[in-house]
């Protein structure tokens, strides 16, 4: 019973942390999608999409590794839009930060990491 309670508390805590992380992210405006990746997405996914910093160390909230083409290419564009807008696991929701059409325009940036 203790394990279940502790697990539930950890899950709730992780959800709250992910929610708080989203508050610090800038709202998208304009049309510079690469700049938004750099300003917001790279905080967790890294500048190169790997979830690691330039020295190769995992980022504190290392997100999905877009350079893992086996995993990244399994996802449909609609999956990426849904995950980005609604959030998943450690990924905060961006529905208050970006319009669905803007998320769709970010997908080529996400996909280019798996192509390398």
Descriptions of predicted regions:
Residues 4-13:
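Sec-dependent N-terminal signal peptides
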Residues 34-61, 90, 112-116:
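Periplasmic/extracellular electron-transfer cofactor-ligation site
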